[in-house]
Amino acid sequence: MHSLIKEYTDKIAGRKAYWIPLLFYTFGAYGFSMLNRTLGADDLGTPLYVNDTVWLQDLRWGAVLWKKLFSFGSFVPFLDKFLSICFLMLAGTAFSCLLYLLNGKRERVLLYTIASCSFLTFPIICEIWEFTCGGTLIVPGDFFCIFMILVWLLCRITASEASSNPQNAASGASSPARPQALSAGRRHPRQSSSAAILPQQAAVLLAAGVLMTPVISSAESIAPVYVTTVLIILFYRYCIQRTSPERKSAWFFEGVRFAIPLVTAFALRLIIAYSILAVLGLERKHTGATRIEWFGMNAEKFAALIKGMFINYGVASLINFPITVFVICAVLFALRCILLTIRRRSALPVFLGICIGLSLFLITLIQGSVMLYRTAITLMVFCAFVFYLFAETFYAWINAGIINRKTLPVLAGRCGLVFLLFITWRQAAHLHRFLALNNLRYDNETAVMQEICYTLSTDYDTSKPLIFVGNFSNGDAMYYSTHDSGKTRAGAMYRKIRHKIDGTPVWKSPLLVQSTVSSAIDFYHEEFDGRLMGEYIAYYGYDFNVPALSRDEHIPYNEEAAGLGMKPFNIADRGDYILICIGSLD
């Protein structure tokens, strides 16, 4: 593996044609976010998530480990985002290294530039990027670890192939290795017996499982990334490479061996997590969308699940750019699978293609709930792989045109590569837009909170409990920036289709993002029974008495504020406590 990384660095990653575009796209997408302070949901959650027991009770002890090792404090936005960008660039480079090993070490730098840049700019990551406590640092680091573990495993596979098939090893690195290592293919006469190599293989697979344990213990959305990437490896090795295995079942046995580290990691995760709960005397709890909903599933809920998934990951392509890119990639990938099936006279490309498609929504298959965009990070890997496949196709056109001395294929191939780079830039621009909007949301909320806190400190007795009621709004400008207006044909069509599917009123504007640009004020005074609202106010330099109240406990205070006719930003001294209306009471 060390020699592979050195070779890849010298021939690909160290070339200006690779790292200059990588830096250009990365800082175009994330530079503003890294260099500007933004406080949002979860950002002040370190005292609860890491120092307290929230993540431990949710079996996310790996996330605690990440924060303890790589972050320093409750809210260090520049450091967390800087490290996140570093991990994300390393993850993109590791993903390209994986492709470099898969394709027989082709030295076409632009292939890997497109794969890396399209991966790290896919805009769905904006849903978790600003969560500097729970997502920003952890997810990019997990991506990097998973890709490096798979590079290591694939290195062992190709090394095993080389030792078991000297003729194939002698043919040179330019020809793809035959996909029979760690599988049940027919052995070469010089190959050692399976009984002799099995202990070494088992040790490698178990070691990979141990390394992956803290990674999949960070968040539920990480394990599907491993599954999707493994299926991509199998698809490329057994459907794209021209050499075919000696046994049709070779792909299955290789897939089983890739599954062993994941199963090992899951088992170790549960053993360690429940051991921690037992030692600390804690109970298992769920935070966020982590519950298994299949147990209470009925026909009506199942229909709602199917409709929700179809709307979010199909119909939404009419208005939501990252979903548009995903749907186009999915359609083109499906056509590629069909063509490969016809050409190879085998159903394997279609079968593995379906498996890849299902793996993208593995969270829904496991939990029985509509997959939120913030957990749909498998789409980043899938779309980057499809971009890479078409970059390969365009290079094939260029080579064919040069060999046959025809200008049109060369021109078409080069235009195709430029188009992929352009779409990658559009992804970066879209990502930057919503991260910048989130910064504007922070500026607006900061102005509101500073004015409210100053008024309280000068005109009221702040030793009394402060009760915050209502739902904050960032105003019409922010609303129309994060919702589809319906004025375009695509927007109007989306609303009509959505209405026919689930009955949502046509006038209701759909969100373009689910997590980004969400109100920090609402989060801190509602979530975790308002236990973080005091921390939120202290962030602005004020130490007030803010009691922790559950949603149910807030209801009578909301009703009281409505009865008083309070408007947004009104303050009322009620004798024993002070009511602060921060938004709509509806």
Please provide the spans of the model-predicted regions.
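Intrinsically disordered, polar/acidic, low-complexity terminal segments
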Residues: H2-Q57, W61, K67, S71-A91, ...
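Membrane-lumen/periplasm interface segments of specific transmembrane helices
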Residues: G28-A29, S33, G255-F326, I363
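Membrane-interface micro-motifs in multi-pass membrane enzymes
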Residues: L56, R60, V109-I157, S217-A219, ...
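Hydrophobic, aromatic-rich transmembrane alpha-helices
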Residues: T93, N320-A347
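Membrane-interface transmembrane helices that cradle and orient dolichyl/undecaprenyl
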Residues: C145-V204, C239-P245
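Signature aromatic-anchored transmembrane alpha helix within multi-pass, membrane-resident enzymes
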Residues: R187-H188, Q201-A202, Y395-A429
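Membrane-interface alpha helices of multi-pass inner-membrane proteins
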Residues: Q201-E220, L231, T264
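Perimembrane helix-loop-helix junctions
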Residues: V225-V263
